């Protein structure tokens, strides 16, 4: 069905890009998945999970909302950190609307205040989205909303729980009305602009985050080397997990290969659920010293390589 058929004769379609910005772990990826109604971006309790711009696509009435899940904004130290923060702000400046997410529990901490201050320079309508409202008393929420709007007057304010879904539909309807008039950019059955091989790599990276609780996840990356559709309808996927040292490789493998087997089993199951076909996943772990300084790895992640 085309956008015009979906909208009905004479109905005006709308389409626009909406960037979600905020501190790490504020719930941007969870919100994108809740709005889309399907998993298009990985979610982890660890900060800095999202590294590149991931777009989720939502149809609401006669509007197509293209959500841009940006990396969390923080004080960058490593080259990779700088690339992620630069990518986040470029996503905000390139969008039609900007949703500034705040964590209701953390309130207007230094990180949140710095983001709001910088968001003032973005020349688009800005929407305040206070997430995790189920964890905070209403009086504290109202004070937080008032303080945030005093720093930067927002076009709209929403209080939501991305995890439970409370308030998400109201936000979706508002975004549908606020994106500019125009034709749909993507087919109506498309939920993300990320290729499946990229999402598959992200899913495996998510499983690394959930299995390994030290710094290792931040010093690793995953690439899909091959994606082959077999005659029986199943998919064969080969992926490489890059780490910086041999000691890290041993951690990923685990005793007798137990850790990598568990990571692979969970990743395989989730990829199969998303694709709807059986998946044969083969994982390899390789040491690539200083991969965080390799321009090719940045291109694979969809990031611009910082020269300094």
Swiss-Prot record:
Pfam families: KH_2, MMR_HSR1
Presence of keyword DNA damage: no
Main localization of the protein described in the UniProt heading: cytoplasm
Membrane topology qualifier: Peripheral membrane protein
Domain Era-type G: 14-181
Region feature G3, mapped onto this chain: 69-72
Gene Ontology, cellular component aspect: cytosol; plasma membrane
Gene Ontology BP annotations: ribosomal small subunit assembly
InterPro entries: G_ERA_dom, GTP-bd, GTPase_Era-like, KH_dom-like_a/b, KH_dom_type_2, KH_sf_prok-type, P-loop_NTPase, Small_GTP-bd
Region feature G2, mapped onto this chain: 48-52
Region (G4), start-end ranges: 131-134
Cross-referenced Gene3D superfamilies: 3.30.300.20, P-loop containing nucleotide triphosphate hydrolases
Region (G5): 160-162
PROSITE patterns: G_ERA (PS51713), KH_TYPE_2 (PS50823)
Ranges of residues in domain KH type-2: 212-289
Ranges where the record places region G1: 22-29
Binding site for GTP: 22-29, 69-73, 131-134
Cellular location(s): Cytoplasm; Cell inner membrane
Biological role: An essential GTPase that binds both GDP and GTP, with rapid nucleotide exchange. Plays a role in 16S rRNA processing and 30S ribosomal subunit biogenesis and possibly also in cell cycle regulation and energy metabolism.
Subunit description: Monomer.
Similarity comment: family membership: Belongs to the TRAFAC class TrmE-Era-EngA-EngB-Septin-like GTPase superfamily. Era GTPase family.
Protein name, as recorded: GTPase Era
Source organism: Bradyrhizobium sp. (strain BTAi1 / ATCC BAA-1182)
